[in-house]
Curated annotation (Swiss-Prot):
Taxonomic superkingdom: Eukaryota
GO biological process terms on file: mRNA processing; RNA splicing; tRNA processing
Protein name per Swiss-Prot or TrEMBL: Maturase K
UniProt GO MF annotations: RNA binding
UniProt function note: Usually encoded in the trnK tRNA gene intron. Probably assists in splicing its own and other chloroplast group II introns.
Lineage: Eukaryota, Viridiplantae, Streptophyta, Embryophyta, Tracheophyta
Species for this entry: Thujopsis dolabrata
Plastid as UniProt keyword: yes
Keyword RNA-binding appears in the UniProt entry: yes
Localization (cell): Plastid, Chloroplast
Chief subcellular location: plastid
Keywords: Chloroplast, mRNA processing, Plastid, RNA-binding, tRNA processing
Length: 509
């Protein structure tokens, strides 16, 4: 019995590194085929399977021929002038991408032990607002921050090398290489013949490549940076007895006391690093000297250049001093501000009053950028004056009010933790008046007539859900300085994403 268990464990370990047996699973092929049909909304799969082009049957036959060392293999047929055949070829290729992605995901789930252990706590980490409480705890104790934009352009052979670390069978690697080069050729019209864009389209395969690439970067990068900072802190050490240390310095005649800066020694003490990432944006919070920040930037450049064999543009790493400048992240302006505190301490009969200075994280909602985004979406003009949404006049009154209501609720929940709440209510006024003008334009009347017809429903039924959020989140005993982050936000606000894209273009230019 023990021998049987040992053999089963060996077979299980063998399956973790060899992915081609999963291609022969009919259930995985059916799941990928049905998933791809659901995405395209097709219910007639009769014209989809083309025997001369890519399909799961072609994949199986190709793997068998590779095992027999037959070099005359063609995974993808030549292009034909017939549009139906070309459509079937593209559909079959995309369907095979779905199947191959499922096979890779299943093999990773079988191999990774942390995958099953982390499933219970996955739901608690879905919100992107879990980043901001972490930043409120860590950033006030840092003095530098490095804003990194992860490169999303990578050669297909680099991706093959990444997957080669945990895929041991040659047929699957050859199939992956063929798929990547075929997928790369689809972007040849845009002069991307040598580069694979892993975030080019929001497909399952592209997201899988992006996550694998980012995981590979972080698995090597984060331990490297932590090891660097740990070595720096051990090199200089900490000096708890500073008085005794300065007395020793006074006894040295070669180094006069006025030429020794004890402030630099204090900054070299207890260096640490914190890392957080969302999408392609990464933040590294540092506590150390400017020299350590320059060394960290130097190592980051060389890491991507030599490990992934790609040129890392200098504008992708921006090092900032938190006490002097602010930075943008996830649609917020982040600023660390010093806040003085007066502390009274009583010892026996004496009363001492001391001043303490603490750092506080202040996330600011970009009101002007939101107004510009609303103007671009035709909710107001450039000056911020509300206008009617003419494209929504064909909808019913309830649909118009619900659409404006959802826009405001999403904005309010996303920027619920910002310190400039007054600017958000200015946005609410613009949306409310734009909603009234849209209804007036639909009924060919004025805002006053619409308000008289609808009564209080326009102002109470719509744009009122934030009151429920405030009443459930705040209480009379809570501090007014404490911010509330909504834990149901799983993605960035579209207006914030639009503003972030504009910021990225300005940085590149």
């Amino acid at each position: 019995m023990d021998e049987f268990x040992x053999n089963s464990n060996k077979n299980r370990x063998w399956q973790q590194f060899f992915x081609y047996p999963l291609f022969f699973r009919e259930d995985l092929x059916a799941i990928x085929h049905d998933h791809h049909l659901d995405r395209f909304g097709s219910s007639e799969p009769k014209e989809i399977x083309v025997x001369n082009f890519x399909s799961f049957l072609t994949v199986k036959r190709s793997i068998r021929r590779i095992c027999k060392q037959n070099k005359s293999i063609s995974l993808f047929g030549n292009s034909d002038s017939n549009k139906l055949i070309e459509y079937n070829k593209n559909f079959s290729f995309k369907s095979m991408l779905e199947g191959f992605t499922i096979v890779l995901e299943v093999s990773i789930a079988m191999r990774s032990k942390h995958f099953i252990k982390g499933m219970d706590g996955w739901n608690s980490l879905r919100s992107i607002h879990c980043i901001f409480p972490f930043m409120e705890d860590k950033l006030p104790h840092s003095n530098y921050i490095s804003d990194i934009r992860v490169p999303y352009s990578i050669h297909p052979e680099i991706l093959v090398r990444i997957f080669r670390r945990w895929i041991r069978d040659v047929p699957s690697l050859h199939l992956l290489r063929s798929i990547l080069h075929e997928w790369k050729n689809s972007f040849s019209r845009e002069n991307l013949e040598k580069v694979l864009i892993t975030q080019r389209e929001n497909t399952r395969f592209s997201l899988f490549l992006w996550n694998s690439y980012v995981y590979e970067c972080e698995s090597f990068l984060i331990p490297l940076i932590k090891r660097f900072f740990n070595s720096q802190s051990l090199l200089y050490g900490s000096f708890p007895d500073r008085t005794h240390f300065e007395k020793k310095i006074k006894d040295i005649v070669i180094f006069p006391l006025h030429k020794i800066s004890t402030k630099k020694i204090w900054l070299l003490k207890d260096s640490f690093i914190h890392y957080v990432r969302y999408g392609e944006r990464s933040l590294i919070a540092l506590k150390g000297t400017h020299l350590q920040v320059k060394k960290c930037r130097y190592h980051l450049f060389h890491f991507w250049q030599y490990f992934f064999h790609l040129w890392f543009q200098p504008y992708r790493i921006c090092s900032l001093e938190l006490s002097k400048t602010s930075f943008s992240f996830l649609g917020f302006f982040i600023h660390v501000k010093m806040r003085p505190l007066v502390v009274r301490a009583k010892m026996l009969d004496d009363l001492f009053i001391t001043d303490l200075i603490t750092n506080e994280l202040n996330p600011i909602a970009p009101i002007r950028s939101i107004l510009f985004s609303l103007a671009k979406e035709k909710f107001c003009d450039i000056s911020g004056w509300p206008i009617s949404k003419l494209s929504w006049t064909s909808l019913s009154d309830d649909d118009i009010x619900d659409r404006f209501d959802r826009i405001w609720i999403n904005l309010f929940h996303y920027y619920s933790g910002s310190i400039n709440q007054d600017g958000l209510y200015h946005i609410k006024y613009i949306l409310l008046l734009s909603c009234a003008k849209t209804l007036a334009c639909k009924h060919k009347s004025t805002i006053r007539v619409v308000r008289e017809q609808l009564g209080s429903e326009l102002f109470t039924k719509s744009f009122s859900k934030e009151r429920e959020f405030i009443s459930s989140s705040f209480s009379k005993t809570r501090s007014q300085r404490e911010r509330i982050w909504n834990s149901e936000i799983s993605q960035r606000n579209p207006l914030x994403x639009l503003w972030q894209k504009m910021e990225n273009k300005q940085i590149e230019n």
